[in-house]
Regions:
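Non-heme di-metal
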Residues: 1-178
Length: 178
């Protein structure tokens, strides 16, 4: 709970966060279009402005107390994704159907299925964090340093990468899904 809870200032901060977040996304889309049309400088300026908007959004989000611990952030993200697939997109699909937009309703339902997967992923990651099983598993895994590519086989990632000296935080279970 932030010191702004229940105030008009809280609503203003939420609106500022939403507006800056939307502007950032729009400007990245605009940059892609400008690049495709051959306007490199304009694309770069859209991206620069998008980065500014991202920082503005972060400032307002932090003011609202929106950034917690990783475990808290995973729980909040899972709850948000749950709302999106169980309530928001389900309602949007129903409305689109009623208003004669079956193709859009189908897209809303497809995105809802993706949001469900996002929720499941966040909940699995939260379980790993809470059980202290992010960098240690009960069976042998192949761990890869995300910085230099060093490979380690074992039940846990090393504290420090023996090749590049980056911390354990850079290790992940090697995924070869190709």
């Amino acid at each position: 709970m932030s010191k702004y809870t229940g105030t008009q200032t809280e609503k203003n901060l939420e609106a500022a966060f939403a507006g800056e977040s939307q502007a950032r996304n729009k400007y990245t889309y605009f940059a892609s279009k400008a690049k495709k049309e051959g306007f490199e400088q304009i694309a770069a300026l859209f991206l620069k402005t998008a980065d500014n908007e991202k920082e503005h959004a972060k400032m307002w989000f932090k003011e609202l107390g929106g950034i917690g611990s990783t475990a808290g952030n995973l729980a909040a993200a899972a709850a948000g994704e749950n709302f999106e697939w169980t309530d928001m997109y389900a309602g949007f699909a129903e409305t689109a159907e009623k208003e004669g937009f079956p193709e859009l309703a189908a897209k809303f339902r497809m995105v809802a299925a993706i949001e469900k997967h996002h929720e499941e992923r966040y909940r699995a990651l939260l379980r790993n964090v809470e059980a202290q099983e992010v960098f240690k598993k009960s069976d042998v895994k192949v761990w890869e340093c995300r910085n230099c590519g060093h490979i380690v086989v074992g039940e846990q990632a090393p504290e420090i990468c023996p090749t590049c000296a980056h911390p354990q935080a850079y290790f992940e279970i090697c995924a070869e899904n190709y």
